[in-house]
Regions:
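N-terminal glycine-/serine-/threonine-rich beta1-alpha1-beta2 phosphate-ribose binding loop
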Residues: 2-168, 184-196
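Non-transmembrane alpha-helical segments in soluble domains
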Residues: 11, 55, 70, 116, ...
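C-terminal helix-rich "cap/oligomerization" subdomain common to oxidoreductases
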Residues: 12-35, 332, 435-502
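Hydrophobic residues in well-ordered beta-strands that form the structural core
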Residues: 44, 172, 197-199, 392
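Glycine-rich, aromatic-lined ligand/substrate-binding cores of catalytic
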Residues: 47, 250-435, 441, 455-461, ...
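Short, solvent-exposed loop/turn elements at domain surfaces
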Residues: 50-54, 76-79, 140, 235-237, ...
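Short, solvent-exposed turn/loop segments enriched in Gly/Ser/Thr/Pro and often Arg
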Residues: 73-76, 131, 150-156, 176-178, ...
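A contiguous active-site-proximal alpha/beta segment in oxidoreductase catalytic domains
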Residues: 169, 177-251
Length: 502
């Protein structure tokens, strides 16, 4: 048995825990701390702005030792982000180093050198390795127990499968994959390997407990519709492909960044935060935000296998020689859209429509809000029954029956608590996943429980890409009314990038 297999077995057995009494003193921690030999060694893959923002959560977890970082970019100070210095302030606060990268204000850092520096600064040593290619990382550091994947969406699936096939536990940002068939394979690989997995959106999901109680006691009659709307996208959704070819930045491996996707010239409009808007690289606003709001809804109502997915989307017009014409666009998500999913009845639940809105779209104001002289917020969720409605925040927080008079006799749930951001927050999901890595039960955010939401966000993308109402055969994973759409359910992998190759 290999050394890394021995170590993982040791972490997952009570016999291994008992063996601490004979370890050399240099491997023992101070009183009350977890010994280094019992920590989960983890590689953090993806050190762009989102990856760096998430890294402090791992560093603050006592069960975890970050030993390596990986990213195709060595270093850059010109990343794109949600604000100019917000990331820098967050990192300084997390590291308790107000002077970290002093003089770099007004720039946005990123890359594996920055990630390594964060890890080494936090631990007070120089023990973190850094790689451009995750495959080299896996080859050279076989004793790594787990990985966290914070790359652009198109790389999630292949990296997750490569890690799980090597017996490594995995935590990943949303989505699991940005192709339906690839997401299915990721979930099946998690099932067949038995490693501990955690899908990060679980940590931000709201509770369906109160909403379910009102549905079950008949407060809104039979549930018919669920409406969920977001103010995303808050990044550019480019309506045309880049035509210029700027040079690849020094220290950036464009080929590695492309990963499984087909070759094309480098352009900065594909990378950083704007990857979300491209069908090849991202998953659109529903993949970005719908996992946070809807996963708990899918789980509670057992939603999967929609029979129909119907898109309504904005379009682009251009003038060419004085004549207006539409832009044919099957490469980027629209600026605004509404997508309706029709889910069949299941068990005691009747058929339900789920309607997703983005880009400023939302349902019309219902009479119940007119009665209260109120209007919808920019983001929210509404459950519509044949006898009433429940309005909640975007992530199902603070649900209430509308109009207000209907709350009489229905105590409102406590307001959702907001965690302070002064220190890194250790989500219950991270702790539960760490316990699963050591042989405990899978976390409630396990990949095995994400099939329904992964199916929906990938079908949403296919419907928008084809601009067609699609009829879907869930059992056979097939679009039945528009054969051309089926090619978008899976990915055509570049040579050397198929799940079998990595």
């Amino acid at each position: 048995m290999s050394n890394d297999s021995n170590r993982r077995k040791f972490l997952g057995t009570t016999a291994g825990a008992a063996a601490f009494t004979i370890l050399p003193r240099r491997l023992l921690a101070r009183s009350g701390e977890i010994p280094p030999s019992d920590k989960i060694t983890l590689a953090h893959i993806g050190t762009g702005t989102e990856g760096l923002r998430e890294l402090p959560n791992l560093l603050a977890a006592p069960e975890i030792q970050v030993v390596s970082v990986c990213d195709p970019c060595k270093f850059a100070a010109g990343y794109r982000d949600w604000s100019r210095d917000g990331l820098l302030r967050d990192i300084r606060r997390a590291l308790n180093k107000p002077d970290w990268r002093a003089g770099s204000e007004g720039t946005i850092p990123g890359g594996r050198d920055v990630g390594k520096n964060m890890v080494d600064t936090f631990y007070g040593n120089q023990g973190c390795s850094a790689y451009a290619d995750f495959r080299e990382l896996f080859d050279k550091q076989k004793d790594v127990d787990a990985v966290k994947i914070m790359t652009p969406d198109h790389l999630h699936g292949v990296i997750a499968m490569a890690a799980m096939k090597r017996g490594k536990h995995v935590i990943v940002h949303k989505p699991i994959a940005n192709r339906l068939m690839e997401a299915d394979r990721v979930i099946e690989t998690a099932r067949s390997t038995g490693v501990a997995t955690h899908f990060m959106p679980w940590d931000s999901n709201g509770s369906m407990e109160q909403v379910l109680a009102w549905i079950r006691d008949g407060s809104i009659g039979t549930l018919r519709e669920i409406h969920n709307w977001t103010n995303r996208p808050v990044w550019p959704q480019y309506a045309t492909l880049p035509t210029d070819t700027p040079p690849v930045p020094e220290g950036f491996d464009w080929d590695l960044w492309l990963g499984p996707e087909h070759e094309r010239p480098y352009h900065p409009n594909y990378t950083n935060m704007v990857f979300r808007g491209w069908y090849d690289f991202g998953g659109g606003s529903m993949a970005d935000m719908g996992h946070y709001s809807l996963w708990t809804v899918f789980r509670a109502l057992d939603l999967s296998g929609p029979t129909s997915i119907e898109p309504m989307a904005s379009h682009e017009q251009v003038l060419t020689d004085g004549a207006a014409s539409g832009v044919k666009n099957d490469f980027s998500f629209p600026a605004a859209s509404v997508v309706r999913f029709q889910y069949p009845a299941r068990g005691t639940r009747g058929a339900v429509d789920l309607i997703w809105y983005e880009g400023g779209m939302r349902p019309p104001t219902p009479p119940e809000l007119d009665e209260d002289r109120q209007e919808f917020g920019a983001e929210a969720m509404m459950f519509v029954g044949d006898k009433g409605k429940i309005l909640a925040g975007f992530r199902v927080e603070n649900p209430r029956l509308i109009p207000e008079r209907r709350m009489s006799g229905h105590p409102a749930p406590p307001a959702a608590a907001r965690a302070p951001r002064e220190t890194p927050q250790l989500s219950p999901g991270l702790r539960q996943w760490a316990a699963a890595c050591k042989g405990g039960a899978q976390s409630p955010g396990s990949f095995l429980l994400a099939g329904g939401i992964s199916e929906a966000v990938n079908l949403y993308a296919v419907a928008l890409r084809t601009r067609r109402r699609l009829f879907y055969d869930a059992a056979n994973r097939k679009i039945t009314n528009f054969a051309e759409a089926n090619k978008y359910l899976s990915r055509e992998y570049r040579k050397g990038w198929s799940p079998e190759s990595v």
